[in-house]
């Protein structure tokens, strides 16, 4: 196996046995690909902005004299880069410029003669841009657009499963769902009539829609029924016989022909009878005249002599009608063939309840239903019906919808047609009737073949189209009004509606969410989230159990484990590890192809629909050397059902064991031993882990930690291979390999690192280099670790030494006992960064001022401010300290005589301003790490702002100069090489000034040309540097674009260091969560025979009932991993030679049956030394989900580390030194500190705010609220008989307003008594009763 440079530094021992056929695809591709499709210029006009423009343009004026045509669009360059946008609080976007052509036709000349053409580029607003990591910066905050799982457009056949009608009869319905436009529903009622609804309005008989399409009753019957022909012969009737139609009927007369009786009267017609009739070739039989009575005529029969109708189409035939027919000379008669079994008379019955007679009356009926109360005219009715389903502006099935529609009704043509046609409607009705007749199946709407993914690009395109349509209306009106000769395209287009639509979508759509930025995993998971909620989706209240449940088609597409607990369960899902979207938006998952019983490495992506046709073997099926299946019978899936199949039947095989689950779930080692409910909690809690101060890779992982860390974008990854030229805390410089160079560039890559910035969740984002100068790196190598990453691997928590045992009740009910050593070593210390903002506005009374001159504030309070009134960087502040001094003018008030005196003595200034400074919130203390001042254009900058500006300019200049020097150095080195080739000596060059090298000349023409090219490049480089610096300078010095009325904004960043303490929530990766109950001194913790104390004591009772046994296996394997590290440490202490280390490492990596082949011999001595250094803390292990380390391997590893195979050690009580009576399970578990910190939750209330209506105290920390004394607490006091306590709880301590004030007075006066009055909420109750019209009054007892 080939390891990259960073991977060699610490090789994970992999226990997986299945070969890796397919690497996990790039995790953010669902976001990036979708948005690229939206922005990229698509020549076909199928997707993105191009499609939106083409669907709206050309816009014609109402009078047809002119039209506005779309030519092309281009996106400009963003003004600020991503970081600047975040700092300034603006949106990261590109301007959209569209080239439009206004064509004016000549009124007087023949139609289509062009009079004038004007082209112009028009600005159409800003399009937010996706960053490289799949997020958007909107108003300075990072947001993610979550993909939506919605019902695919197309036609769906469904039934109510007998729930609608009391009889329990199953009613079938069909629904045509377009991508945009009106819904069309067909449904049966309990009397078996077929109805149609448009847009879920009131129902009409379904024949109305056929009539509206111009069909007569005869044609309608012709479409839906088979016919039976009767010939009238004297007194008998000859019936045309189709033997198959008789099957299952009871003969009501003897069936005989040619003198032979086939079926006697009263007998049932069987398959044997039918065979005999077919064999004898009987095609007509005689039937009694009574047989035809009650049959239904299929067409109109007319007496040609008189012209009157004898029998109407769809009319039942009576004996009288029969007589009239023979009299009129009709020799044959055609009736509808119906029976109760599989040819129901549904359409015939429906026509009877249909009151309309022709096309116009049908159209009018539809118009009345859609626009009740409006007088229908023929034209209006026709126009409405036409626009419902047949106009491209109003109705679009979309490519997906047409594809689904055609495959459902079995139509081959009309691939591109977005609207419906007559055939579509007829076919849907036919299929629905066939289903009612018992042929065919209803669809399963939870099948992933009927639900598709709508990603960012598609939703943005839809919003953009909405904006364009709004513009279209305005353009049409303007084209019709104005003087066209003077108008340019610019004057027609108002970009506001477009900007507004796009802004609304990115800023406030339900699916545009504030990015969960706790740690890299939460970012990745958020971007891979699939929600069924949102516009055009479900609502929590309406979603039933079926939609939320795991469906068989989720296999390998959506994770069956990771979903929120609570009201959204099952509605928000996560994409499985290998899943991807196909061009239609359906989810696909990869499978290995099986050819002639041999599993190949060819991979096919199958959607849920395609998968149904195949037999698919599981990923853990045993294979032979040749790649065939080892067992005769294998577990496989077919049509979603798992079962045993002969191995010859398998057509595909899963690609990996973690194919089924999401990224978060595949990070849980030994997932296969955990109960699903706990695994769900484990997957969800990893996303809440706070990045610790020192990241620590998990000893027991699953092998995909590197994928998550690299794909999340929090690490710095090498874009091209090369050698590290220099490294410092804020930048890494790589000299690129020759073969990866683009001709004519300097060949230097510079990576600027992010230092101590704030994330959305107030955690700290900081990158640390993990490479040294001179190290070779290749493309994709990790150069710097971000938050929660360690040597390029995801590291959410810390490896803790754990014992499972009770300890004096301190770990009762999931509490956690932690050793003081954990706090001392800062294992779970986290940095949180808060942003506090102070805004100076223009008020009616004058403008607010940021100043250090604040009235009535002592010197000590101002000690941390500079002369501008802004706190200096590095100050340690605590709750209540002033960060930014600000004064606000206050209105003139009535002055007291004392104040007047003060004014007279001290002049005017004493009290016309009030102190509105920004102070540190009460519960916070920390260090100021950054201050930013934004000043409105045209307002003079204060001293601090200018200082910051100078500093930024200096930094920018330093950065760019360094960058320039590095690039220049690279270029001059190449110049030097050319000059030496041309015959100059090294010594001469070293004495010449390097800048002068470019002026030297060479004999050789080729080399001279090269030298001249390099000189040109140097000039370009210099010009580029000047231009870049100028741009940077302009950005830094220009005023800021602030909201109206805002003069100045000061942002102060405060870093808080939080150590772990009782009340903080911690968890493992298996859903085993708990709260710290006590921090115990190290000397009191249990310790083993070597004197090593444990870090954490967990309660063993937390394991059996929760069935998450994975944690026990993790602890055992962690112990072995740490044991190997200890053994390496021992060897280092003994200073053994390198060969011994190589031998031991080879032994470790070869242990167990694994797919991983690590060849220690192929590593250089330096690489082995680095590896040893990194393994001293323990051997990192990968145990992939569903393919983890078996028990035997764990025991073998424990044995190799000289530890007991049981994984249990003798422990001693730290307080007494006595041995505990049984061995205890001790080992290493990866523990996370979750973002539920006691510091953020702790809260106490004194007198505070009250609710307006009930006058009760508010609740919650944010409102400085109280604790609710609820009904159960009231019952408790009632049960104790504590009447007076109860009285004060319900009155003076809650909502008795007068009582409250009196009590305060009494306490001040030293009189400790209370007089409870009427609680305000009782008055509210009285008012509510009165509002119901019941007069209720309180009467005093006399």
Swiss-Prot record:
Its EC number is 2.7.7.6. Keywords: DNA-directed RNA polymerase, Nucleotidyltransferase, Transcription, Transferase. This is DNA-directed RNA polymerase subunit beta. DNA-dependent RNA polymerase catalyzes the transcription of DNA into RNA using the four ribonucleoside triphosphates as substrates. SUPFAM superfamilies: beta and beta-prime subunits of DNA dependent RNA-polymerase (SSF64484). The RNAP catalytic core consists of 2 alpha, 1 beta, 1 beta' and 1 omega subunit. When a sigma factor is associated with the core the holoenzyme is formed, which can initiate transcription. PROSITE patterns: RNA_POL_BETA. One of its GO terms (molecular function) is DNA binding. The keyword tRNA processing does not apply. One of its GO terms (biological process) is DNA-templated transcription. One of its GO terms (cellular component) is DNA-directed RNA polymerase complex. Belongs to the RNA polymerase beta chain family. The lineage of its organism: Bacteria, Pseudomonadati, Pseudomonadota, Gammaproteobacteria, Vibrionales. It catalyses: RNA(n) + a ribonucleoside 5'-triphosphate = RNA(n+1) + diphosphate. It comes from Vibrio campbellii (strain ATCC BAA-1116). The keyword Nucleotidyltransferase applies.
């Amino acid at each position: 196996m080939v390891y990259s440079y960073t991977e060699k530094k610490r090789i994970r021992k992999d226990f997986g046995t299945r070969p890796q056929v397919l690497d996990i695809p790039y995790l953010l591709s669902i976001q990036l690909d979708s948005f690229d499709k939206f922005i990229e210029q698509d020549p076909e006009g199928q997707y993105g902005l191009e499609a939106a423009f083409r669907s709206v343009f050309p816009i014609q004026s109402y009078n047809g004299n002119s039209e506005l045509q779309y030519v092309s669009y281009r996106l400009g360059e963003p003004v600020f880069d991503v970081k600047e946008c975040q700092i300034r609080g603006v949106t990261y976007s590109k301007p959209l410029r569209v080239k439009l052509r206004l064509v004016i036709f000549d009124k007087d000349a023949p139609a289509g003669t062009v009079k004038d053409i004007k082209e112009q580029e028009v600005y159409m607003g800003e399009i937010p841009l996706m960053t490289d990591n799949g997020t958007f910066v909107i108003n300075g905050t990072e947001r993610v657009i979550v993909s939506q799982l919605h019902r695919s457009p197309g036609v769906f056949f469904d039934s109510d499963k007998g729930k609608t009608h009391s009889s329990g009869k199953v009613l079938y319905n069909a629904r045509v769902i377009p991508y945009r436009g009106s819904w069309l529903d067909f449904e049966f009622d309990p009397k078996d009539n077929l109805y149609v609804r448009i847009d879920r309005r009131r129902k009409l008989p379904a024949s109305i829609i056929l009539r509206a399409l111009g069909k007569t009753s005869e044609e309608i019957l012709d479409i839906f029924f088979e016919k039976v022909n009767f010939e009238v012969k004297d007194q008998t009737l000859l019936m045309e016989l189709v033997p198959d139609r008789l099957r299952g009927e009871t003969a009501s007369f003897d069936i005989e022909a040619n003198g032979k009786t086939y079926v006697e009267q009263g007998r049932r017609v069987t398959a044997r009878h039918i065979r005999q009739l077919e064999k004898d070739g009987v095609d007509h039989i005689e039937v009694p005249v009574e047989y035809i009575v009650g049959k239904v005529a299929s067409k109109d029969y007319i007496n040609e002599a008189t012209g009157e109708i004898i029998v109407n189409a769809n009319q039942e035939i009576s004996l009288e009608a029969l007589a009239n027919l023979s009299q009129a000379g009709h020799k044959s008669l055609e009736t509808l063939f119906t029976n109760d079994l599989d040819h129901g008379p549904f359409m015939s019955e429906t026509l009877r309840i249909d009151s309309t007679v022709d096309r116009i009356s049908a159209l009018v009926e539809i118009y009345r239903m859609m626009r009740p109360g409006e007088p229908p005219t023929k034209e209006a009715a026709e126009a409405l019906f036409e626009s419902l389903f047949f106009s491209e502006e109003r109705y679009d099935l979309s490519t997906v919808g047409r594809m689904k529609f055609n495959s459902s009704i079995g139509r081959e043509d009309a691939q591109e047609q977005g609207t419906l046609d007559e055939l579509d409607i007829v076919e849907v009705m036919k299929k629905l009737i066939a289903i009612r007749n018992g042929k065919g199946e209803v669809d399963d709407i939870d099948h992933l073949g009927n639900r598709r993914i709508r990603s960012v690009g598609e939703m943005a395109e839809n919003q953009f189209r909405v904006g364009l349509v709004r513009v279209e209306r305005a353009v049409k009106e303007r084209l019709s009004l104005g003087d066209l000769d003077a108008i340019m395209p610019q004057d027609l287009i108002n970009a506001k509606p477009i900007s507004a639509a796009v802004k609304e979508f990115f800023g406030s759509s339900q699916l545009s969410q504030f990015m969960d930025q706790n740690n890299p995993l939460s970012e990745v998971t958020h971007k891979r989230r699939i929600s069924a909620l949102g516009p055009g989706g479900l609502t929590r209240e309406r979603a039933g159990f079926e939609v939320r449940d795991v469906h068989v088609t989720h296999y390998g597409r959506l994770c069956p484990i990771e979903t929120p607990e609570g009201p959204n369960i099952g509605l928000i899902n996560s994409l499985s590890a290998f899943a991807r979207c196909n061009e239609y938006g359906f989810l696909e998952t990869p499978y290995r192809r099986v050819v002639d019983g041999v599993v190949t490495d060819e991979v096919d992506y199958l959607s849920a629909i395609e998968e149904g046709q195949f037999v698919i073997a599981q990923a853990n099926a045993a294979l032979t050397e040749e790649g065939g299946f080892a067992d005769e019978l294998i577990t496989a899936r077919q049509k979603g059902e798992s079962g045993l199949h002969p191995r010859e039947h398998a057509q595909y095989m899963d690609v990996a064991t973690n194919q089924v689950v999401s990224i978060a779930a595949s990070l849980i080692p030994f997932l296969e031993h955990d109960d699903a409910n706990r695994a769900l909690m484990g997957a969800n809690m990893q996303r809440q882990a706070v990045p610790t101060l020192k990241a620590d890779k998990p000893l027991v992982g699953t092998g995909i930690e590197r994928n998550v860390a690299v794909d999340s974008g929090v690490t710095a990854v090498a874009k091209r291979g090369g050698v590290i030229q220099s490294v410092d805390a804020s930048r890494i410089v790589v000299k690129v390999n020759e073969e990866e160079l683009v001709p004519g560039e300097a060949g230097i890559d510079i990576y600027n690192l992010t230092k101590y910035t704030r994330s959305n969740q107030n955690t700290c984002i900081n990158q640390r280099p993990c490479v040294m100068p001179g190290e070779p790196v290749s493309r994709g190598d990790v150069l710097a670790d971000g938050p929660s990453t360690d040597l390029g691997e995801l590291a959410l928590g810390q490896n803790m030494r754990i014992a499972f045992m009770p300890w004096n009740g301190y770990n009762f009910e999931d509490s956690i006992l932690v050793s003081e050593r954990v706090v001392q070593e800062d294992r779970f210390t986290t940095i949180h960064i808060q942003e506090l903002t102070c805004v100076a506005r223009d008020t009616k009374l004058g403008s607010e001022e940021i100043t250090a001159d604040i009235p009535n504030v002592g010197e000590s309070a101002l000690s941390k401010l500079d002369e501008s009134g802004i706190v200096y960087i590095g100050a340690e502040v605590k709750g209540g300290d002033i960060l930014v001094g600000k004064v606000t003018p206050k209105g003139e008030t009535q002055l007291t005589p004392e104040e007047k005196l003060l004014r007279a003595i001290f002049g005017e200034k004493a009290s016309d301003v009030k102190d509105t400074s920004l102070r540190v919130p009460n519960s916070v203390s920390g260090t100021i790490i950054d201050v930013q001042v934004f000043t409105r254009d045209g307002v003079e900058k204060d001293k601090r702002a200018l200082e910051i500006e100078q500093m930024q300019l200096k930094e920018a200049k330093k950065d760019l100069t360094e960058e320039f020097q590095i690039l220049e150095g690279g270029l001059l080195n190449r110049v030097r090489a050319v000059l030496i080739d041309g015959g100059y000596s090294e010594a001469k060059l070293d004495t010449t000034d390097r800048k002068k090298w470019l002026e030297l000349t060479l004999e050789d023409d080729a080399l001279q040309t090269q030298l001249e090219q390099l000189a040109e490049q140097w000039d370009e480089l210099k010009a580029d540097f000047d231009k870049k610096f100028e741009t940077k300078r302009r950005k830094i010095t220009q005023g800021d674009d602030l909201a109206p009325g805002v003069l100045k904004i000061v942002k102060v960043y405060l870093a808080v260091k939080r150590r772990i303490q009782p009340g903080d929530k911690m968890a493992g990766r298996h859903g085993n969560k708990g709260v710290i109950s006590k921090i115990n001194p190290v000397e009191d913790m249990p310790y083993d025979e070597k004197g090593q104390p444990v870090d954490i004591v967990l309660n063993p009772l937390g394991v059996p009932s929760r069935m998450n046994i994975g944690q026990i296996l993790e602890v055992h394997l962690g112990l072995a991993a740490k044991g190997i590290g200890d053994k390496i440490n021992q060897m280092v202490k003994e200073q053994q030679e390198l060969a011994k280390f190589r031998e031991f490492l080879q032994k470790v990596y070869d242990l167990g049956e694994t797919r991983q082949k690590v060849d220690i011999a192929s590593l250089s001595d330096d690489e082995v030394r680095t590896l040893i250094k990194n393994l001293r803390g323990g051997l990192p292990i990968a145990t992939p989900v569903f393919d983890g380390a078996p028990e035997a391997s764990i025991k073998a590893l424990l044995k190799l580390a000289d530890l007991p195979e049981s994984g249990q050690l003798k422990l001693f009580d730290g307080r007494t030194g006595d041995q505990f009576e049984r061995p205890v399970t001790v080992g290493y578990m990866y523990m996370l500190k979750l973002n539920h910190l006691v510091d953020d939750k702790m809260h106490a209330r004194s007198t505070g705010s009250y609710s307006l209506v009930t006058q009760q105290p508010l609740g919650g920390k944010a409102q400085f609220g109280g604790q609710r004394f609820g009904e159960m607490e009231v019952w408790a006091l009632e049960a104790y008989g504590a009447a007076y306590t109860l009285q004060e709880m319900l009155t003076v301590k809650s909502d008795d307003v007068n009582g409250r004030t009196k009590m305060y007075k009494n306490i001040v006066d030293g009189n400790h008594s209370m007089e409870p009055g009427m609680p305000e909420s009782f008055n509210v109750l009285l008012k509510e009763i009165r509002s119901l019209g019941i007069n209720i009054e309180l009467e005093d007892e006399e």
